[in-house]
Regions:
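Short, low-complexity, polybasic intrinsically disordered segments
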Residues: 131-145
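Catalytic cores of nucleic-acid endonucleases
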Residues: 7, 18-27, 85-133
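Short acidic/glycine-enriched loop/turn segments that link adjacent beta-strands
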Residues: 63-66
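Acidic-basic catalytic patches of nuclease active cores, encompassing PD-(D/E)XK
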Residues: 7, 11-18, 22-59
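Protein kinase-like catalytic core scaffold
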Residues: 77-79, 125-127, 137
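Conserved catalytic cores of phosphodiester-cleaving nucleases, focusing on short active-site segments
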Residues: 68-91, 106
Length: 145
């Protein structure tokens, strides 16, 4: 029996590594699909902002603390937007998906952006854009930092 356990362990280790590798590929593919779907709705939100007089500065700004979906300007005010999409009501309200933890990450990332670009004294606000099906909801000053 002991003799059989060693080959079994080796078999499991080898196959588990392959399994982990395959799962990793699947997770990456799902993540890439989610990103590409998210990118479509971020583009729609960006178009919406442009149509409402905003100047788009950047999509998907990344720093060590996280990511900001859209950075725009509304007059002299820098607007840091989080875009959330839901396919329908059964998936939940997209605006409720921006919880306190997410707000803190966005705030820290925005702080990093302002320091990096030398605009620490600029007026800023945090908006959330919810896309539900084909409906866009824009909440200005959704939270404060």
């Amino acid at each position: 029996k002991i003799f059989l356990r060693i080959p079994q362990r080796m078999f499991l280790k080898q196959n588990f590594k392959n399994y982990e590798k395959e799962c990793g590929k699947m997770k990456r593919n799902v993540k890439q699909n989610n990103r590409s779907v998210g990118a479509v709705y971020e583009q729609a939100a960006g178009y919406y902002l442009e149509q409402n007089g905003y100047e788009l500065i950047e999509y998907n700004y990344r720093c060590r603390d996280g990511e900001i979906d859209i950075i725009a300007k509304d007059g002299d005010c820098y607007v840091f937007c989080e875009v959330k999409y839901r396919s329908g009501r059964q998936a939940g309200n997209p605006l409720e998906a921006v919880d306190q933890r997410k707000q803190k990450k966005i705030f820290r990332c925005a702080l990093y952006y302002t320091v990096q670009h030398g605009i620490e004294d600029a007026q800023c606000r945090f908006d959330v854009i919810g896309v539900e099906g084909t409906e866009i909801t824009h909440i200005k000053n959704a939270f404060v930092g």
